[in-house]
């Protein structure tokens, strides 16, 4: 559909012909300009456009009116994050059309996208001659609980991220009645915000490429990468279950993987699969669709877990929760409860309680929902917390917002080198995250930079997949482009003469096939010829290694090491698996392995 000026309109049959276009959905097929639809329009309808600035740039909507009503809303242009911003837009569009009001709350977890969408719709409503100010005074519309929700179930799962979906779907596939609670207005947790990479030893790409790997080798990498603090038994469960979890995602979840792998820091070999779309949304959206098709699984958004319920023997037999949109309270009765609500990276007070260095000056990549609520809730009934002082920072993050920078994956694609303001390399680019983060802190201004060129960028799909991110970084001065090294250094004040020497030295190492300075462990690719790019970055809190102490059956343990009957935990919610530091792509493996373990064992109790 071509763009319209905001005061032009289409009438009658032309709009009726749009009836078959794709309905809006937070996990609908991805694309910059999609047709987002809520409601239906008939003869006499008119179309009005409105525009606002969202998180990913300009957002344009088309509001279809019939008389004084909004018949539906089409999204003409959007670069909001797939499965996150788009999910918030989905919720608001549905509320607006069904309830004929603009008096709606922003969707938690997608606030910026929600605000932009509402502003654009308001703009279009004003263009139609109606007054958005009047629409905003109408009766408030709020999301409702799923139809047919019951509080007497077999299994309650808290947290609709990767671990939560794995647990809930596994229990539901075993024939149990399951409810999955999510306190935000969107699902996905940190999994949907991630790149979705999953470490899997002995996968078919390794066999195709002649890469020797084993469960034991991956387990050793994880244990060494965590300084031998993680529980080897828990690590072995993750590594042994990785291949099966990958197959489950394919055959039960419909997840598709790209035909290549990525090397992550701290691993001894390349073993990490990348989902279609290069994002965790390529996993979560498939699992959410699978959940929608199961009658015995209800996903409750805007529903916060408040209190675990125990019987006289101490067994967990239910959970109290509140719908934050409607104010309704629930007293769920269940045979088992699974906590999969992630870590506490977004809770500065809690971070500082366990590690005073992780103060408010350090931003976070994490979901706004990663606040440790369930850590506290479980601790109140005697659950043991372990390794809480170990908090990981991700090295290549936005210096202004703290968001993880996917352009920074040029490092993981072996197409960039890390430099400082003096123009020198200061760390091996494929080192552990904590090693790189600590090295960045020692550099001038606590900021690192990476340099790559157009040829390197063209060898990846990073520019295509992350176009909106790159545009934003250019606009805010965190990414620069220049025909020469001297030109690209200028915006950052980097020593161009020294960087020229550094790049020439690197290119020589690539020719020789060895890096005597830092022992680079992956493929050595030269940076020869412009245009050149430089990206500025700094570390942000990314993952909390500590959490509820569990055993290999995902049962939560008390301070004496005994299982608390009926209580399970999985994913970042559970600690003592990663040790002092997590290797990249092992979290996705963990959430789906232990999510399935928790789901299966909880189902066995029901």
Predicted regions: what they are:
Residues 240-328, 347-350, 398, 510-529:
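Conserved redox-cofactor binding core of oxidoreductases
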Residues 146-161:
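Beta1/beta-strand and adjacent pyrophosphate-binding region of the FAD-binding site
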Residues 74, 307, 498-581:
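A glycine-rich dinucleotide-binding beta-alpha-beta segment and adjacent secondary-structure elements
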Residues 39-139:
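Active-site- and interface-proximal helix/loop "cap" or "latch" segments in soluble metabolic
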Residues 332-398, 594-597:
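Glycine-rich loop(s) and the adjacent beta-strand/alpha-helix scaffold that form part
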Residues 375-379, 383-494:
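An anion/pyrophosphate-binding glycine-rich loop and adjacent beta-alpha core
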